[in-house]
């Protein structure tokens, strides 16, 4: 289906812009939110864990974590290895997560209005398959 990527990228840009506007009240961007979301969902995490989850270079995640530390939303705790940096949410980070999660959930519900539940489920299941196909294609290229 030609034009799918263009449509998807247009939606993605609009969504990121909307999320950045929503999160700006907390001095956050979507990229910072991803770190908070990962830690809340997976518990204390290393920089490597977070960078692998989002397929982002470790130095990029390091900069995001430093910004969140400045905002007092995350802190480093000792890891198994002293070279390993483990990041966890602070009380403030958890509070902000709860507030933002509610707003993001409300946004999800509002943008899905008028779309049948079966169509929502189809999109929910199709997107990870596309991501997997892309990952497999990239993986096959390097072999």
Where is each model-derived feature located?
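N-terminal leader segment of winged-helix/HTH proteins
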Residues: 1-26, 73, 95
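Pre-recognition alpha-helix immediately N-terminal to the DNA-recognition helix
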Residues: 14, 18, 34-37, 95, ...
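Key DNA-contact positions within bacterial/archaeal DNA-binding proteins
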Residues: 33, 59
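Short capping segments at the starts of secondary-structure elements
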Residues: 42-46
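The alpha-helix within a helix-turn-helix
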Residues: 51
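Charged, amphipathic alpha-helical coiled-coil/dimerization segments
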Residues: 66-125
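C-terminal regulatory/oligomerization modules of transcriptional regulators
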Residues: 118-143
């Amino acid at each position: 289906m030609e034009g799918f990527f263009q449509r998807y990228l247009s939606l993605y840009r609009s969504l990121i812009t909307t999320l950045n506007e929503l999160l700006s009240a907390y001095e956050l961007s979507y990229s910072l939110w991803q770190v908070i979301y990962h830690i809340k969902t997976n518990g204390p995490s290393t920089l490597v864990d977070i960078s692998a989850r989002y397929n982002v270079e470790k130095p990029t995640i390091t900069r995001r974590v430093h910004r969140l530390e400045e905002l007092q939303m995350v802190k480093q705790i000792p890891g198994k290895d002293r070279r390993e940096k483990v990041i966890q949410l602070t009380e403030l980070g958890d509070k902000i997560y709860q507030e933002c999660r509610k707003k993001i959930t409300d946004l999800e519900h509002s943008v899905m209005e008028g779309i049948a539940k079966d169509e929502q489920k189809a999109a929910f299941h199709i997107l990870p398959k596309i991501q997997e196909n892309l990952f497999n294609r990239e993986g096959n290229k390097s072999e």
